[in-house]
Amino acid sequence: MEETEKKIATQEGRLFSKMKVFLLSLTCACLTKSLSGVYMNSMLTQIERQFDISTSVAGLINGSFEIGNLFFIVFVSYFGTKLHRPVVIGIGCVIMGLGCLLMSLPHFFMGRYEYETTISPTGNLSSNSFLCMENRTQTLKPTQDPAECVKEMKSLMWICVMVGNIIRGIGETPIVPLGISYIEDFAKSENSPLYIGILEMGKVAGPIFGLLLGSYCAQIYVDIGSVNTDDLTITPSDTRWVGAWWIGFLVCAGVNILTSIPFFFLPKALPKKGQQENVAVTKDGKVEKYGGQAREENLGITKDFLTFMKRLFCNPIYMLFILTSVLQVNGFINKFTFLPKYLEQQYGKSTAEAIFLIGVYSLPPICLGYLIGGFIMKKFKITVKKAAYLAFCLSVFEYLLFLCHFMLTCDNAAVAGLTTSYKGVQHQLHVESKVLADCNTRCSCSTNTWDPVCGDNGVAYMSACLAGCKKFVGTGTNMVFQDCSCIQSLGNSSAVLGLCKKGPECANRLQYFLILTIIISFIYSLTAIPGYMVFLRCVKSEEKSLGVGLHTFCIRVFAGIPAPVYFGALIDRTCLHWGTLKCGQRGACRMYDINSFRHIYLGLPIALRGSSYLPAFFILILMRKFQFPGDIDSSATDHTEMMLGEKESEHTDVHGSPQVENDGELKTKL
C-alpha cells in the first residue's frame, strides 16, 4: 500500500513538472509570437517608406496577419483539442518562423533604396540643381525614362511581406486557444488566473524585446554594408529614412523556430492537477485517467461541432463579451499600430526614439499589471461577479484618464508654403499655390521635391532651392546652405538639412504624455485578467477551446483586419505633402497636419471604446440573474460552470441543461 502511494506521489510530481514545462514553453511561445507581431508593427513606417506606399496599404499589410489567422482559428480551436495539442503548437511556431523569414526576403531581391532628393551625395557642383539658380532653362520634373519606371515596379514586392505576414498568422493560430484550453483542462481552476497572468506577462515581455529590437534596427540604415553612410544627406529623424527592417525579421524567424522544440516532447494529456480521484495506478506503476477526465475527452470527440456553436451563440454573456471585445480592440489596435507615427509627427521624434519610448514607458507597466491582476485573483479568491465589477470600474477610470491626452499636444512644424507663409504667419493648410513666393520665383525650383532645410529664422523650407539658397559648404548631413534669400534672421541667411526641432514646451508635454501612458497602461492591464476570467467562466469546460477560438475569430474579422486599413485611410487624409517617385507617382507621406492627425488618432479610439461600455453594462446586469457555484461554495471553484438562478430551488444551465436539485448532482451533470 505504501509503495502504491509513493508511486502516486512520484507520478504526481512528474505531472506537476510537465505542467510547469508546458507553462514555461507556452510562455516562451507567447513571448516570441508577440515579439514578432510588435516588431512588425514597429517597422510599419519603415516598410511604408521602403515601398513608397500609403498608410492604408501599410495597414493592410499589418492586418494581413489576421487574415491568415482568420481561416484556421475556429477549426484549430475545436478540432485541435482532439489532436496532440503541444505538437500542434510546436508546428505553429515553426510556421511563424518561416513566415518571418519570407518577410525579410524582399530586401535581398531589391536594389538599393533611393530616397527622394536633388542633392548630390558628394556635393558635386555639376549637379547642384538643389540650389537657387536664376534663369535656369531646365525645369526640374520627375524622370520619365521607361527603364526607370519599370524599375519602380520593385515596390510591388510589399506583397511578399504581406504573404509572409499571412503565413505568420497561420502559424500563430493554435498557440493561444490550444494553450489556454490545455491549462484549463489539466491545472487547478484556482491556479488558472495566475497561470494566465504569467502567459499575459509573456505576451507583454515579448513586445518589450520586440520594441527594443525595432528601435535598434530603425537606427541602422536599410542598405548597411552596401553604401557609404557618410554620403547620406538624411538622418534617422528624417521622414525619408528607412531602417534595417529586414534584420529583425531574421531574428524573429530564428527565435520562433527555437521555441517550437520543447513542444514536441510534451505529452498529449495530463491528469487534472490535484484531483487524485481521476488518477489510477496500474500494476506496472503507470498512471491512467478515468472518471471525469476520460468522460470529458470522450465527450469532446462525440459532441457535434454545430451544437457547440449553437450553445455559444445562445449564451448572452458570451456574445456581449465578444461585442465589448471587438469595440475595445478596434480602439486599441488603432492606437497602438500608429503610435510610433503619432510620436514622430506630434513630438518630432525619430522612429527609433518613438519605438524606444513605447517600449520603456508603455509595456513594463502592462506586464506588471497582468502579473498583479492574476495574483490578486488567486490570492483573494475573487469571485466571477466581483471580477466583472472590478474590471468594469477600472476600465472606466482608465478611459477617463485617456481623455487627458487631448491636452498634451504640440503645434504643426513651421514649414513655409505648407503650414505657414514665407513671412512666418500661419495660414490655411492644403494650399498648393503658397509653395512659391517672391523670394524664390526666379529660382526655377521643383514644387514637389521634399528635401527640407531649417533656416536660422526657425522656419523650415521644402528644399534649399525654395529657401532661395545659392551656396553651400560641407558634405553629407553636415551641409550648410548660405545666401538664402527667403531667410531673414538678424542678417544671417543660412540653413541646415532637416526640419526644425520642436521647442522645449513640446518636449515637456511629451514627458507628461509618457507619464500618463504609464498610469493608463498599468490600469488597463489590471482589468485584463478579471475580464478574461469572466469570459472563461461563462462557457462550459468542453466549449472553452471553441469559445476562445470563436472569440479570436470575431476579433480578427471585425477588428484586426479592418481597423488598420480604415484607420490608415483616415490618416492619409491628413497628409500635407506626399513624396514623389521617379515617374511622377505618389509615394509615402512626408508630412501630416498634426491637428487633424491628433483628432483622428485620439478621437476615434475614444468613440469606439466609449461605445463598448454599453454591452459591458448589460453584462453586469445579466450576471445578477446568473449564479456561479464559486459564489456559494469556494470548494466548487473546480466546477465553475455558470447556472441561471431564476428561483432558489430551481437551477437551469445557461446552455439549456436539465434541472438539478443539489450541488452534488450539479457537479455530476457538469
From Swiss-Prot:
One of its GO terms (biological process) is sodium-independent organic anion transport. It holds the Pfam family Kazal_2. Residues 645-654 have a biased composition (Basic and acidic residues). GO terms for cellular component: basolateral plasma membrane; membrane. It catalyses: estrone 3-sulfate(out) + hydrogencarbonate(in) = estrone 3-sulfate(in) + hydrogencarbonate(out); taurocholate(out) + hydrogencarbonate(in) = taurocholate(in) + hydrogencarbonate(out); L-thyroxine(out) = L-thyroxine(in); prostaglandin E2(out) = prostaglandin E2(in). Residues 645-670 are annotated as: Disordered. PROSITE patterns: KAZAL_2 (PS51465), MFS (PS50850). Keywords: Cell membrane, Disulfide bond, Glycoprotein, Ion transport, Membrane, Phosphoprotein, Transmembrane, Transmembrane helix, Transport. Residues 1-20, 81-86, 185-203, 268-311, 378-381, 537-545, 624-670 are cytoplasmic. Disulfide bonds join 439-469, 445-465, 454-486. Residues 433-488 form the Kazal-like domain. GO terms for molecular function: bile acid transmembrane transporter activity; organic anion transmembrane transporter activity; sodium-independent organic anion transmembrane transporter activity. Mediates the Na(+)-independent transport of organic anions such as steroid sulfate conjugates (dehydroepiandrosterone sulfate (DHEAS), 17-beta-glucuronosyl estradiol, estrone-3-sulfate), conjugated (taurocholate) and unconjugated (cholate) bile acids, prostaglandin E2 (PGE2) and L-thyroxine T4. Also capable of transporting sulfobromophthalein (BSP), ouabain and gadoxetate. Hydrogencarbonate/HCO3(-) acts as the probable counteranion that exchanges for organic anions. This is Solute carrier organic anion transporter family member 1A1. It comes from Rattus norvegicus (Rat).
